[in-house]
């Protein structure tokens, strides 16, 4: 017997916790009925609320789940509180009941009508109806939802009636109100009623307001009535006043009142279309006992039962004793001896029931089952979501570029752990902070702050990796570029390989990035709008570019919600919950280059003015500090991440976004909206707010924002009404105090911080409070157990409990986003070990530089983690990484072996060849014949590869079904290797092993394009080609072997392998009897004969010097020994075997041809193949002639030992790659791993996932270093101050006043460290005059001068003059010939008359002016003069002059070719002299020590020479250019000096000169040319030989040659040095005073004379020019403006002035290549014939542009698909040569 009791009050547990846990369980797939009930109950309640009058409907807030109402105290204590509590009680009953049965698989829902009765009190009685009507558990959601709706209507009616008896106060007091019922113990109902009648008659109480008995039991009586009358009763009545009485928690009104309610009220409650429809389907099954009589209700339909129950609740008093009597009577009437009482926690009625069972039925055993207890039990096994909408979201990968040098999460954590505040002045690569900053806020368009937090070198980008041309990269927003880079890194960390699993289906991966500005497009690229202005600048292209590059077909969203954009993008998890995608890449981006935004935010009073990141929660917080940042995260549903074997960094439990609609202004935060959001998000996540132990707050450092946020946080997570225990501390922090406010990336940055905190188990110190805490913060934070971590605080894992945190991210536009994040579960240790003995580790890259970097990083990782599992490493680098065209694969069995092999590849990386871009090589399967393996094998593949084992066992089953014995003993190692099995077993084993191997290779993605089988192997080949089924192949092999055993004598004949050609054999053996069985190769032949005949042959051939090996076979195949079986074998084959057309070409060693048709292979063919010779040599040669095979193919030997591939290598002149499947005597896994590595490096795309699948449960993804990018800077510098002026003149007067010695600055778009201001310029069609002025005291210029110190003075080196010349030359060419391209500049005839020395007083300016004049640009010459400017603004006579001669770098390269071998010869001679101890070999440190001691002390960045070999006045040096940043240059002086100052070194250090008495300085050179750019970090070699001149022995001349990779790429020709006595050093090189006109240099040759050059001055070049001037043709090709930028990029301006120049060849193909190079921003050297245009960044847009240029300039009409039809440079050249030569 069963009794289910439903109470009229909630269990004494924490009600909110019960509902929260039920909500969490409803997401579990084990509770589908529970989830359905909550959904249907929610819908039912919504329908009821919608039907209310407007006034009542407004009292119920919107709710997403019926359970959410439990947290709404205001509603539950309001007018409809009784209705809501009734709903919640019924919902709790039914949900708990459903969950109880779903949680326990042993419990069955078996409430039968015979032995079950249902009882309940008050609202609990309604819950019994749902059970009574439900024949199964699956019906409870429907009946339960109906009960919920009726419970609500009951509550509304009760409220309506009760309000008429005693209205609620107009101003509600805190709390639920007064009680409508009191219980009086130890009295009789008769006494109570008598007293009530006496008082109410005396007071003439109106009938509806009378107090009445609503419930009675053996121990007490309950009286009910309006609260005021109840209070009056207990006040005026001595009877009641003197007795103990207790108010019950009945606050919603009256029930059990027959004098108030009638049938009308009952009908109002049960009138429902839902009830009518249910009545037709459901009928009462289980008896429900009346609480007034104890007898079952008599209703026969659902509606009748509801009517009876509602009438009972409204009009009948509760008499629990009657209910107990009814239950006891049913127990007596039944045959049961025990009773299960189902309860919702124990209670007084339950105790009374059990006590009665004990007294009245002593032989009857009654026990309780608590239906609530299951709710709090831990899940075992772990919960699985019932659907995608219920999934948790795993974060499986992250990458970042954040301020403070945080180029990865580890560096970011270092910054946080150190408590750094990484603000700094706005760097020069963004804009000139000095000119764009005004602390007083008075200047138009200026920023009020000079500070921010910035990414280092945001222009760094590996353009070729992402198939972008340099030009496209330059014009593409760095936010887009870095989003690409970090997305790749995050995906790499996550081990995401598209299409590896269902969750990584490329069609189901989407991207979601937050971005709130387009700075680079608005400022940088807007200076020069070109092809990629839209695609590179508009933010929608950022996520789209990621999808396009990775070939993801899911959605791509760019999200802009202002400051919360990034975390709003993290709500990509909503797409995961909705099932729109399986994997999401989400994040935020922000790179600040637009000074307008600084000015706008300053004027809006958003920004702090003080030098700090955000002063979060500080008393003086005055705004936020802007910040860069790029973050990418990879998200998956948790169950998918676990199934994919991912590393889980954290788990998102819930995310939500709302808006502060009620704020006082759009930008003002609103604590109420924030609190509502976080409360809702936490509740949806199923988390108790007190389980949150950390909140990463938005915390921008504004007074209003910080104060409002702490209010919302304390309200939800640390309220006064409910206190946290001492074990529930809550910490708060904000990453903005460290790295500033990244705006659109601030949310993802905070999330990365949180994930690192989980990982490091620590909370970093909060560094935002610089003085004292914000006075608006609550003063009782400590009492609330809420803490700010002023120092790093441990945050350890707690066994059995998860750390949970909240991340807040709010928007200045009013949006609020909150995310609940839980730490990942600790992964269970692997249960076993990977049985494979050898593991394949791969490394790949898209360039040699990156390959080298990746190898170095992996080696460093293995050295730092010597215990790393090689199996894990192999799994990570193969199955969990993308693979590129530069590939390295290493099969290793231990770490030492791995490091050694990786080191070997690292040494040879420069000669590494990438895989061809033409696609995968075709594959040939070559099937081995008999005799290659041991008689017995022990195949590790059979033991450890489930796939191979299953294939082999299936084939064995086919063999046994045909009557053959099992061949498994041949391969399973159950016998010694030498054990001889029957020929049938051996031959079946061979063929079946080969078939299984072929299928195994195919499972790994290696499918044959051609097959060839040797002897017995041909049967396996025919099967793989589709000619034979596996069953037929086994049948033929087995029958043939059986016939051989029956009709041929084992051992009577032999086969002899001879290392000789057939012709050689014939010439030696003459007429001795033998047969030729196999012609395997040019010198590989197999003979057959009787044992005696073979013995003679062996003796003769060995005597002739030929190696002979007797094959270990039972029969002499392909010889006369097989004649007895041929007829029968052919007949059996004809009758039983079905031959199908081949689906692959078959190379036939029998016929010596390639088989394509369906008729050739038949019974006759296999008969002949048994008897006739195998002509493997002839077959391969024919196949090659027919082009069936070629040198590109990959050969795989399918068999027990490599034989055929050795034959192939001896036949073909070149074999791409040839690998075995198994090698005799070698562990199978070692062979397979090595072969897979070779195939991988040959370009085959392998199914690595399948290779590791069987072992994956024992494998883990290793957190390896990320890809080593081959970065170069691509950056368009914002030039000038046009963002300030915007065409206005309001700054002109200010500039003139600040610089009285200069003209008003004209608006030029050029500014570098040495060319700071164009003060005058005049341009005509072909002539120009430009005058620039610079202050030597500016930091970068001064630092460059002090980098070259002589006599303790900063001396402007000639390389600085060269940089000025390059800058002005480029500027003039751009102005006069804006479309020019590929023009180099020769800085010729430099003559320095006075040294320029930095003054000591840096407080005063030290100006110089340089004038540049071009008479006719088409003559290709410009003339420059340098002048000092005195303090009064007067310009001195020129102290230096030079010419710029424009020319073609290609011509220069050609002109240097004849000298190359001479220079190389001299270098080699110096090397030999050094080895002989004659020449001096000096290290880097020694060379510069000597240089500094003798004359010049160079700064570190100038010290490029790594070693010097010197003999007398001849030397060469190996040079590496620095990567150190600093300054804006066209050609950094320290680059020029590093490759050129070898000449000065020789003159001032060589023992051929008397350096003790003399020193040497250069007055100039004849020519300086660089045909290729000087690039940071690259290596060069300089060579010079200085020779004294005949005219003056104190003057020396020489040519400095600069080589790269053995090619001369630059020259400083006719460089001159003059020798001076050392006693003059102090006189010549001393710092001047502030008036530079008084300074006289060592080379002063003329008296001071004031010279002011006007715009009309004409200078005639009379000096001999070192190279022929180039006539500049009319501009034709559009190209980007040459802009000096950061050092790494700008060097290109030296050799490439983006202009159309005649090329050296007149062919259309050559012109076309030059045009392609120009359009893509490439060098011609970047266009080898095998270069793929797609990899060079030639996309569809560029294709259209180039096609148009071809038409306009070359007269070649093509369409935009040209580069698809001719994908490589060689293809296009060939086409152009064929049709346009």
Curated annotation (Swiss-Prot):
Keyword Membrane among UniProt keywords: no
Record: active site: 563 (for beta-ketoacyl synthase activity), 698 (for beta-ketoacyl synthase activity), 741 (for beta-ketoacyl synthase activity), 1348 (proton acceptor), 1537 (proton donor)
Protein name (Swiss-Prot/TrEMBL): Atrochrysone carboxylic acid synthase
Matches recorded under PANTHER family: FATTY ACID SYNTHASE (PTHR43775), SI:DKEY-61P9.11 (PTHR43775:SF37)
Catalytic activity of the protein: holo-[ACP] + 8 malonyl-CoA + 8 H(+) = atrochrysone carboxyl-[ACP] + 8 CO2 + 8 CoA + 2 H2O
UniProt keywords, alphabetically: Multifunctional enzyme, Phosphopantetheine, Phosphoprotein, Transferase
Native source organism of the sequence: Cryptosporiopsis sp. (strain 8999)
Residue ranges of the region described as C-terminal hotdog fold: 1478-1626
Region feature Disordered, mapped onto this chain: 1633-1653
An example Gene Ontology molecular-function term: 3-oxoacyl-[acyl-carrier-protein] synthase activity
Region (N-terminal acylcarrier protein transacylase domain (SAT)): 15-253
């Amino acid at each position: 017997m069963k009794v289910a009791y439903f109470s009229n009050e909630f269990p004494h547990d924490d009600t909110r916790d019960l509902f929260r846990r039920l909500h969490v369980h409803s997401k579990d797939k084990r509770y589908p009925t529970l989830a359905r009930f909550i959904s249907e109950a929610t819908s039912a309640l919504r329908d009821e609320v919608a039907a209310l009058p407007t006034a009542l409907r407004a009292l119920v807030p919107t709710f997403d789940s019926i359970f959410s109402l439990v947290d709404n105290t205001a509603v539950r204590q309001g007018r409809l509180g009784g209705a809501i509590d009734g709903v919640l009680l019924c919902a709790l009953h039914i949900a708990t009941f459903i969950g109880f049965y779903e949680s326990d698989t042993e419990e069955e829902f078996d409430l039968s009508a015979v032995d079950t009765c249902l009882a309940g009190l008050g609202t609990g009685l309604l819950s019994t109806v749902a059970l009574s009507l439900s024949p199964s558990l699956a019906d409870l959601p429907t009946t339960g939802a109906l009960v919920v709706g009726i419970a609500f209507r009951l509550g509304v009616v009760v409220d309506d009636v009760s309000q008429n008896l005693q209205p609620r106060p107009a101003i509600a007091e805190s709390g639920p109100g007064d009680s409508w019922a009191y219980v009086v113990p130890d009295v009789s109902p008769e006494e109570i009623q008598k007293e009530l009648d006496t008082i109410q008659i005396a007071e003439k109480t109106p009938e509806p307001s009378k107090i009445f008995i609503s419930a009675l039991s053996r121990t007490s009586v309950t009286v009910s009535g309006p609260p005021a009358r109840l209070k009056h009763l207990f006040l005026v009545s001595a009877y009641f006043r003197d007795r103990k009485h207790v108010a019950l928690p009945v606050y919603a009104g009256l029930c059990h009142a027959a004098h108030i309610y009638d049938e009308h009220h009952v009908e109002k409650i049960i009138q429902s279309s839902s009830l009518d429809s249910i009545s037709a389907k459901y009928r009462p099954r289980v008896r429900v006992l009346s609480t007034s009589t104890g007898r079952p209700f008599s209703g026969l339909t659902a509606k009748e039962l509801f009517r009876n129950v509602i009438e009972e609740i409204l009009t009948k008093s509760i008499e629990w004793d009657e209910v107990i009597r009814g239950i006891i009577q049913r127990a007596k009437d039944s045959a049961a001896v025990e009773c299960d009482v189902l309860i919702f926690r124990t209670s007084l009625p339950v105790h009374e029931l059990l006590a009665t069972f004990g007294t009245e039925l002593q032989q009857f055993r009654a026990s309780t089952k608590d239906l609530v207890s299951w709710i709090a039990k831990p899940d075992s096994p772990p919960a699985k979501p019932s659907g995608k909408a219920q999934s948790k979201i795993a974060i499986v990968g992250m990458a970042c570029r954040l301020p403070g040098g945080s180029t990865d999460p580890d560096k970011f954590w270092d910054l946080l752990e150190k408590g750094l505040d990484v603000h700094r002045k706005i760097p020069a690569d963004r804009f000139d902070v000095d000119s764009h900053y005004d602390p007083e806020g008075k200047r138009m368009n200026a920023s009020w702050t000079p500070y921010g937090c910035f990414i280092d070198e945001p222009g760094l980008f590996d353009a070729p990796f992402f198939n972008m041309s340099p030009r496209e990269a330059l014009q593409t927003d760095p936010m887009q570029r870095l989003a690409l880079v970090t997305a790749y890194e995050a995906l790499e960390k996550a081990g995401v390989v598209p299409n590896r699993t269902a969750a990584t289906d490329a069609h189901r991966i989407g991207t979601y990035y937050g971005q709130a500005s387009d700075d680079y497009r608005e400022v940088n690229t807007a200076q020069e709008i070109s092809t990629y202005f839209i695609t590179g600048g508009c933010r929608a292209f950022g996520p789209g570019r990621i999808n396009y590059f990775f070939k993801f077909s899911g959605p791509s969203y760019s999200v802009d919600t202002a400051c919360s954009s990034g975390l709003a993008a993290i709500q990509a998890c909503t797409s995961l919950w909705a099932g729109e995608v399986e994997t999401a890449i989400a994040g935020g981006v922000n790179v600040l280059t637009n000074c307008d935004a600084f000015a706008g935010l300053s004027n809006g009073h958003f920004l702090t003015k003080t030098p700090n990141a955000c002063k979060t929660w500080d008393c003086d917080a005055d705004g936020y500090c802007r910040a860069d940042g790029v973050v990418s995260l990879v998200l998956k549903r948790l169950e998918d991440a676990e199934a994919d074997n991912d590393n889980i960094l954290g788990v998102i439990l819930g995310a939500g976004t709302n808006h502060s609609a009620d704020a006082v202004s759009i930008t003002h935060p609103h604590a109420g909206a924030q609190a509502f959001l976080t409360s809702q998000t936490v509740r949806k996540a199923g988390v108790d707010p007190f389980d949150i132990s950390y909140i990463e707050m938005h915390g921008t450092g504004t007074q209003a924002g910080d104060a409002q946020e702490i209010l919302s946080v304390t309200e939800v997570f640390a309220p006064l009404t409910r206190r946290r225990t001492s074990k529930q501390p809550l910490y708060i922090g904000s990453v903005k105090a460290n790295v500033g406010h990244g705006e659109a990336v601030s949310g993802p940055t905070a999330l990365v911080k949180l994930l690192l905190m989980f990982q490091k188990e620590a909370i970093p110190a909060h560094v935002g409070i610089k003085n004292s805490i914000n006075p608006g913060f609550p003063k009782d934070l400590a009492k609330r157990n809420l803490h700010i971590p002023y120092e790093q605080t441990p945050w350890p894992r707690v066994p059995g409990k998860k750390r949970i945190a909240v991340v807040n991210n709010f928007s200045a536009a009013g949006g609020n986003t909150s995310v609940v994040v839980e730490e990942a579960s600790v992964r269970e240790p692997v249960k076993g070990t990977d049985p494979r003995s050898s593991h394949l580790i791969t490394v790949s890259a898209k360039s040699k530089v990156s390959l080298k970097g990746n190898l170095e990083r992996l080696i460093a990782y293995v050295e730092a983690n010597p215990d790393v599992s090689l199996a894990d490493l192999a799994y990570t680098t193969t199955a969990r990484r993308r693979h590129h065209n530069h590939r390295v694969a290493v099969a290793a069995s231990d770490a030492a072996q791995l490091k050694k092999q990786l080191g070997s590849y690292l040494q040879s990386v420069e000669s590494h060849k990438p895989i061809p871009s033409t696609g995968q090589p075709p594959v040939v399967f070559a099937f081995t014949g008999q005799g290659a393996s041991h008689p017995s094998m022990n195949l590790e593949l059979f033991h450890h590869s489930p796939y191979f084992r299953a294939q082999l066992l299936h084939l064995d089953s086919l063999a046994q079904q045909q009557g053959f014995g099992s061949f498994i003993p041949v391969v399973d190692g159950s016998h010694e290797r030498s054990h001889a099995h029957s020929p049938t077993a051996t031959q079946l084993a061979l063929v079946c092993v080969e078939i299984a191997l072929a299928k195994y290779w195919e499972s790994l993605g290696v499918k044959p394009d051609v097959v060839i089988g040797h002897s017995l192997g041909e049967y396996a080949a025919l099967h793989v080609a589709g000619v034979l089924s596996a069953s037929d192949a086994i049948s033929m092999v087995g029958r043939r072997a059986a016939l051989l055993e029956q009709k041929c004598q084992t051992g009577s004949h032999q086969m002899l392998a001879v290392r000789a050609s057939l012709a050689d054999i014939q010439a030696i053996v003459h007429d001795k009897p033998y047969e030729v069985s196999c012609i395997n190769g040019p010198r590989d032949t197999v003979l057959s004969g009787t044992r005696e005949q073979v013995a003679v042959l062996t003796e003769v051939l060995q005597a002739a010097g030929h190696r002979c090996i007797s094959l270990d076979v039972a029969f002499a195949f392909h010889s006369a020994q097989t004649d007895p079986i041929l007829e029968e074998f052919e007949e059996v084959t004809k009758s039983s075997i079905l031959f199908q057309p081949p689906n692959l070409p078959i190379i036939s060693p029998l016929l010596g041809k390639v088989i394509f048709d369906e008729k050739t292979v038949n019974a006759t063919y296999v008969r002949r193949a048994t008897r006739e010779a195998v002509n493997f040599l002839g077959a391969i040669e024919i196949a090659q002639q027919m082009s069936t095979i070629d040198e590109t193919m990959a050969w795989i030997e399918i068999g027990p030992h490599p034989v055929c591939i050795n034959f192939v290598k001896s036949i073909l002149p070149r074999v791409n790659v040839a690998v075995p499947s198994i090698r005799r005597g070698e562990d199978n896994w070692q062979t397979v791993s090595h072969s897979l590595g070779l195939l991988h490096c040959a370009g085959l795309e392998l199914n690595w996932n399948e290779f590791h699948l069987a072992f994956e449960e024992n494998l883990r993804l290793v957190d390896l270093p990320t890809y080593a990018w081959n970065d170069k800077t691509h950056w368009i510098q914002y030039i000038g101050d046009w963002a300030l002026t915007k065409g206005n003149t309001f700054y002109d007067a200010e500039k003139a006043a600040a610089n009285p010695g200069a003209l008003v600055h004209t608006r030029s778009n050029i500014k570098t460290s040495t060319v700071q201001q164009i003060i005058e310029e005049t341009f005509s069609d072909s002539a120009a005059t430009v005058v620039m002025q610079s202050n030597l005291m500016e930091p970068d210029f001064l630092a460059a001068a002090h980098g070259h110190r002589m006599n303790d003075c900063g001396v402007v080196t000639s390389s600085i003059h060269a940089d000025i010349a390059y800058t002005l030359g480029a500027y003039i060419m751009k102005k006069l010939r804006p479309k020019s391209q590929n023009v180099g500049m020769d800085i010729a005839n430099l003559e320095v008359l006075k040294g320029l020395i930095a003054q000591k007083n840096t407080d005063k300016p030290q100006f110089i002016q340089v004038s540049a004049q071009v008479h006719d640009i088409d003559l290709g010459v410009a003339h420059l003069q340098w002048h000092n400017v005195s303090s009064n603004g007067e310009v001195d006579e020129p102290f230096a002059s030079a010419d710029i001669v424009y020319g073609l770098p290609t011509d220069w390269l050609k002109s240097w070719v004849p000298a190359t071998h001479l220079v190389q010869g001299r270098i080699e001679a110096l090397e030999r002299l050094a080895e002989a101890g004659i020449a001096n070999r000096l290290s880097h440190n020694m060379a510069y020590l000597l240089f500094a001691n003798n004359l010049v002390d160079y700064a570190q960045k100038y010290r490029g020479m790594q070693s010097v070999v010197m003999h007398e006045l001849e030397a060469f040096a190996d040079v590496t250019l620095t990567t150190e940043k600093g300054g804006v240059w066209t050609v950094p002086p320290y680059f020029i000096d590093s490759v050129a100052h070898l000449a000065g070194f020789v003159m001032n250090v060589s023992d051929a000169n008397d350096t003790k008495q003399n020193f040497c300085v250069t007055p100039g050179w004849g020519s300086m040319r660089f045909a290729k750019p000087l690039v940071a970090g690259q290596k060069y070699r300089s060579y010079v030989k200085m020779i004294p001149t005949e005219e003056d022995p104190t003057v020396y001349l020489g040519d400095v040659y600069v080589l790269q990779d053995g090619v001369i790429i630059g020259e400083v020709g006719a460089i001159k040095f003059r020798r001076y006595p050392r006693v003059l050093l102090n006189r010549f090189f001393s710092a001047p005073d502030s008036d530079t006109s008084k300074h006289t240099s060592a080379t002063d040759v003329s008296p001071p004379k004031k010279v002011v050059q006007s715009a009309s001055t004409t200078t005639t070049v009379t000096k001999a020019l070192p190279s022929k001037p180039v006539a500049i043709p009319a501009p034709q090709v559009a190209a980007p403006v040459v802009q000096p930028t950061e050092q790494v990029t700008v060097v290109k301006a030296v050799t490439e002035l983006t202009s159309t120049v005649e090329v050296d060849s007149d062919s259309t193909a050559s012109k076309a290549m030059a045009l392609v190079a120009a359009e893509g921003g490439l060098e011609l050297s970047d266009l080898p014939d095998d270069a793929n245009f797609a990899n060079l960044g030639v996309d569809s847009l560029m294709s259209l542009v180039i096609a148009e240029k071809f038409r306009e300039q070359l007269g070649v009409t093509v369409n935009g698909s040209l580069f698809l039809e001719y994908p490589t440079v060689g293809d296009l050249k060939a086409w152009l040569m064929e049709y346009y030569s």
